[in-house]
Structure formats: structure tokens, C-alpha cells
């Protein structure tokens, strides 16, 4: 039986030969189907000691059905694997989109937080600068108050010198008293106004609306008193010569000498000039102090407006901080939801991995079964090969016997012809015997031919079985190759899934770290905001300054009273430290 193999089947036979070589069969035992045409004939000589293993490309009906069912199963598994891969790609894309959205949100929140931190830092710097300016203004106001007190004492001393019992008369005393009253009234008004301003500053931003009304009224009173003071000074200057004339007349009426009168006159004139120069200097200093007080009032109003602006900005920042807290809570809720979804996805992925591992174990079991079946087929093939060798030897023996019988028949025919020529009479009897012998020989030859045909049929059946076994072996080899490729693909997909799972874990860790950093930064902002609120409360408490002064006066003895004035902010901080346990 000669088969014409196709090139595809020859390639399959070559791959099967490589597989059989790997299983322990040598290349001399593997031949293509076209090698059957070169099998030795009985007349060509004896066969080789290593018989070929025939790999026929044909397939049986059972093999075709199994192959189609397995192919359908493989296609179904391939479609399921593709669907799982597409689902995993979708989930990973969704995760990447979610992480990108979260990164954008966190970047926006971080930018807003940095912006808020910068604005809070700027507000803090402005607040520090304003507090420094306020402390400087308080010090200058205290210094001006001390200077005003000194000027008032000097004016009182000048008035006391003018109203001395030696040289004073009733008119100058009345003028000086009116002038002193007029000069003391605006100073007392200034001192009251300063005290009211200090109380207004201590009251803080809680009462900024009453300040302008009080300042307008006091400015009007202050201007009226200033005009009255200037009129009194002009009257005193105009009435001074008349009073001195009265004094000279009274002195002339006395029993003093002219030299004494001249000396007293010159002394009075010198004292008057000194008093006028002192009054002018005091008036200039008073004008300067008034200008400084006006500037201080303007600075105070500007500071109050700045404090109101800062409070408005602080309220806005509080609202922004509350919004940030709300957005942070929403982000935490969304993050928890994402964590739950991620845990569900991880559970599904773990289930898929377990399914893949189960499929892999099933594939390993199938491979083990195929290996055992292949080994069984190899054993059967070896047994069939032994049977074939035995049949071939029997065939060769029968052919030799046929040759011997043919030679014997030829010899018998020659003897028969010779006997026919030698004796005609004996031919009949001999012919009968020879015919009987020939009939027996022909019968034996027919039996031998019948046996030969049976053996040949058995040989053909065994060859067909062998070709079928070779086809099944080729089919199993192709299935083994496909299964190996499938196992490699599954290994690659498993490695990719593990890498994607590790990336997802790393992304969740990064998100958790960024969340912890945001929480720490929000806590730092909360601490800074509480510190600012405590400082604003310290500035808004008006009763603390009185407590500080009393504590400072009780802390320092009478010998320290003449020392430099202490900083109210430092005293305030010390008082707060004493009050807070």
C-alpha cells in the first residue's frame, strides 16, 4: 500500500519525528510515509535491522470527532481568555482614569492649600507689622503724653512764678488763671481723648463704628478750646503793659527809691519777656503735639480699618477652610468607596486567578493523560512492529518455499518429459502417478497460496492499524504542541495580571501616602489657625492690659518705677503664660 503524502502532513511528520526523538526514539526509526515505496522486496534482500516507524497523515472517524470537539473547546477557552483580558484591560483603564482624576483633584486641592498657606503667611506678616506699628504708636503716644504732662507742669510753674506775692497783681492773676484754665482744658480734653482712643483700641474691632462720631465731637470741642486759648493769650499780651503800669504806679506811690523802681521794672520786663518766650515755645510744642495726635488718630483709624479688613479676610479664610474640610471629607468618602471597589476587583481578580490555576491544573492533568496514552501507543507500536517483523519473516519463508516448490516442479516436468521419451508404455502408469503427485503438489501449492493471501491480508490490516496509530500519534503530538503554546500564553497572561496587580497595589499605597500627607498638612493648618485665633483673642481682650499693669506694678518695686516702660505685648504674653496652666 503506497500513499502519496501532502506537504502539510510531511511537515507534521517531521514535527512528530522531532517529538519522538525527544521521547527516546532515534531518527533512524522515524521515516516519512513515502519511505514505504522503498521497502525491500523479497527478491531485493533482507530488511534492515531497525524497522521504520510509519507516520501516516490519514485520520480516523473517531479521531476526527475528538479533534473537532477539542478544537471547539480550545476556541471556547480562547474566547473566554480574550473576554477576560478585555475585561481586565477595561478595569485597568478605569483604574488609570480614576487615579488620573484623583491626581488632578489632589493637585487642585494642594494648589489651593498652598495658596491659602501663602495668603495666611502674608496676613500673618501684615498682622505682625500692624502690631509692631501699633506698639510703636502706643509708645509715641505715651511719650507725647509724658511731654504734655511736663509742659503742663512747666506752665503751672510759670503761672506760679507770675502769681508770686511780690510782683503779681489781681489783673495778671486773673488773666493767667483764665489762660491756665483755657490751656488746661484742651490738655485735659486731649488726655481724655487719648484715654478714650486707647480704650477704643483695646476694645478692638468690636466697636469701630462709634469712633468717628466721638472723634468729630471732640475735634469740634478741641478747636473751640484752642481758639479760646489763643484769644486769652492775646488778651494777656495786650493787657500786660496796663498791669505793669498799674504796678509801677503803685510802686511810685510807695516809699521806694527810683533805683529800686527801675530795678524792679527791669526785672518785671525780663520776667515778662521770658514768660512770653516760654509761652510761645509752649504754644509751638502744643501745636506739634496736636499735629502728632492728629496723625496718631489717622493712623489709629487706618489700623482699625486694616484690622476690619483682616477680620473679613480671616472669616473668608475660615469659610474656605470649612469648604476644604468638606471637600476633604468628600474625597475621603470617595476614596473609601474606591477602596471598596478596588477590594471587590481584587477579589474578582483572585477568583479569576484561581480559575486560571484550576484550568492550568486541568491542562496539566490532560497533558499527563496524553503522555501516558502516548507511552501506551508507543508500546503498542513496538508490539505491532514486532508482529510485522514476524509476519515479514514468515512471508520470506513462504516465498522461499514457493521457490523451492517451483524448482521441484520444473525438475519433475523435466523428468516427466524424459520418461515420456524413454518409455511410452510406462508413461501411462507413470503419468497417472505423476498426475496424482502433481495434483497433490498443486493442491499443496493452492493451500500455500491461500495461506499466503491470508497472511497478506493480515499484513495489510496490520499496516492499516499501524497507519491509524501513526495518525493518532501525530494528532496527539499536534495537541501537545497546542497545549504547550496555550500553557505559555496562560503563563504570560498570569505574569501580566500579577504585574498589573502590583501596579494597582503601588498606586493605592501612593494614594494612601498622599492622603496621610494631606491630613498632616491640614492638621498643621488647623494648629496655625488656632494660634492666630488665640493671638487675635489676646489683642481683643481689653481687660488684660489693666491686669498686666497691675501685675507689673506689683512685680516691680518702687525703685523700678523710674525705669524704662515695659513693652505691653511682652507683659501681655507673660500674663497669658501665668493665667494658662
Swiss-Prot record:
Amino acid composition bias (Polar residues), ranges on this chain: 161-184
Record carries keyword Lyase: no
Regions crossing the membrane: none
Gene3D superfamilies: 1.10.287.1490
Compositional bias per record (Low complexity), positions renumbered to this chain: 39-59
Parts forming coiled coils: 70-164, 270-541
Keywords attached to this entry: Coiled coil
Sequence segments annotated as region (Disordered): 1-61, 156-219, 496-517, 534-581
Sequence ranges of Basic and acidic residues compositional bias: 185-202
Gene Ontology cellular-component terms listed: myosin complex
Biased composition regions of type Acidic residues, renumbered to the chain: 559-581
Keyword Cytoplasm applies: no
InterPro entries linked: Myosin_tail (IPR002928)
Name of this protein: Coiled-coil domain-containing protein 102A
Lineage: Eukaryota, Metazoa, Chordata, Craniata, Vertebrata
Gene: ccdc102a
